[in-house]
From Swiss-Prot:
One of its GO terms (molecular function) is iron ion binding. Belongs to the Fe(2+)-trafficking protein family. This is Probable Fe(2+)-trafficking protein. Residues 21-40 are annotated as: Disordered. Pfam families: Iron_traffic. GO terms for cellular component: cytosol. It comes from the Bacteria. The keyword ATP-binding does not apply. The lineage of its organism: Bacteria, Pseudomonadati, Pseudomonadota, Gammaproteobacteria, Moraxellales. Keywords: Iron. Could be a mediator in iron transactions between iron acquisition and iron-requiring processes, such as synthesis and/or repair of Fe-S clusters in biosynthetic enzymes.
Amino acid sequence: MTATFNPQANTVFCRKYQQDLPKMPHPPFPNKKGQELQETVSEKAWKEWLEQQTMLINENHLSMLDPKAKQFLTEQRDKFLDNEDYERAQGWTPES
């Protein structure tokens, strides 16, 4: 039996962009939340979040050892991916 290519298996309905887009090749975390993100967030949206996260960590001097910093980033991630108002780095302006 020959495997058939299913393009739908390589896409997800992205919660940020509200359309089918290429999915992340692997869950971003090795847990249930990582699996959920892989099934609902496109690779494009995840890469954009990682850029935002890096700016927030750098600008706010966040330590990933601090549980409050981790909670803050989790909240901001969910807001970003759900198109809600999230905290942006001060020097950042969205592309028009």
